[in-house]
Amino acid sequence: MQTERELRQQIVEIGRRIYEHGFVAASDGNVSARLADGTILTTPTMVCKGRMSEDMLVLVDVNGSKLRRDERNPSSEFAMHKMIYQMRPDVHAVVHAHPPFGTGFAVANVPLDKPLLSEVILTLGCVPLTGYGTPSTDELPQSLAPFIPHHDALLLANHGAVAYGPELETAFARMETLEHFAKITLIARLVGKPHELPPDAIEKLLDVRERAGYMSAGTRGCQACGYSQGHSSTCAVGSATRSYGANGDDTVTLTRRELTALITEAARLVAREIK
């Protein structure tokens, strides 16, 4: 396990990355990491994640209470982090952000649950859409609860996204993969009808993921990205995912001007990331 000082340095770095990638604006988003003693280091409330310093971070107990009086107040959305840590002992880092493409799907009530990319099935799995919960209230973590044990990243209805993992780099990578998948899914829908991977290909990818140890026990059915017909295992939250993402198969209709503007903006964001 990393020391508190090392985690402070890494949280500041992750905050800088999500800001520079355009995953957050102003003081949006929050990042946390769990220490070996069970305490949690989290970003403070109302601070730009791209301009944080190590001394701005807040050390809290499992309930979110400050352990040092002279530190700032923790993120107002810490309850979401608390819920994830309580339900997933294997998780030691959480990243919450508002990536534009992923959040666009969340606002449109469309989960990222189609088996379109082999890399996504291997490294991330299905990204369901949770129900809406008012930010900074207990509604938000409660809306996530049915999905947390079975998934490593979630779209938050009309809000944003959250990703988590055994350490900060993995949590950030999952957020980055979520946004990348959202971009490709949108482009595929605009170009034509996305071609989903066949069942046998999905089964092989899930086998590889299980052998590599990238999948928690009992989550195989949930990681199949929307594929359920004839699957060897089913997802315990499948019905909830479908009810919250009822618009997943709707047709997207745009004017030529709107399509041109969207593709131009997508190209600009991709070029920005390459730089």
Which residues are covered by each model-predicted region?
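Glycine-rich flexible loops
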Residues: 1-275
